[in-house]
Amino acid sequence: MLKIENLSKKFKGNDFYSLSDVSLEIGKGEIVGLIGKNGAGKSTLMKMMAKSQRPTSGTITYRGIDINSKDNVLEDFGIMIDPVFYPEMSVMDNLKFYLKLHGKQEWYSNIEKTLRLVELWEARNRKPKGFSFGMKQRTALAIALVAEPDFLILDEPFVGLDPIGVQKLIDILKQWSSERQISMLISSHQLGELEALCNRYVYIEGGKLV
């Protein structure tokens, strides 16, 4: 479904590669964990998968198409990397704005279901600026899920959550995986979180998979 081949990234001004010759395949319905320390290259890899950064060399293909060759290749993706919501807009308005921005207004009817799934329906008219970190994480997750993507990229979704919050998020993702055969790449510092959720996991260190 998604194939990464010999992917490398060297940022301007650096004399080292932040990502070096990374290759990875993720099949349909597979949940793959990505574990590594800060600075290991997790976010760099995910940002290139999300097209917010371009690789120095190598390719990423989705369903046989190079993601950097067309504008709409990631149409079926749900991405949770950097904050994607507006703190001064209500949760409901954030989801509507996201869907309108991406031309997916047909998913408006899915907003209630998604917010109930992440346990934010009762807070739908509140603004994220006053939320706890965990609620902000779930707001970002709702945006990633609302259009029922076929592929999820989640960078450190468990950071800042207490054990109950972590388990709730794991349960949500498991539910989505069982309901629809969606593929996921999820990064974390904690192996235990990934073991509870993923089919397999890979280690990244110094920009390389080990």
What are these regions (language model features)?
Residues 1-4, 8-21, 28:
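A short, flexible loop at the N-terminus of ABC-type nucleotide-binding domains that lies
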Residues 35-37:
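The feature captures the beta-strand-to-loop junction immediately N-terminal to the Walker
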Residues 50:
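Helix-to-loop junction immediately C-terminal to a conserved catalytic motif
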Residues 58-73:
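Conserved ABC transporter NBD signature motif
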Residues 96, 100-123:
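Conserved ABC ATPase "signature" region
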Residues 152-156:
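Catalytic Walker B motif of ABC-type/P-loop ATPase nucleotide-binding domains
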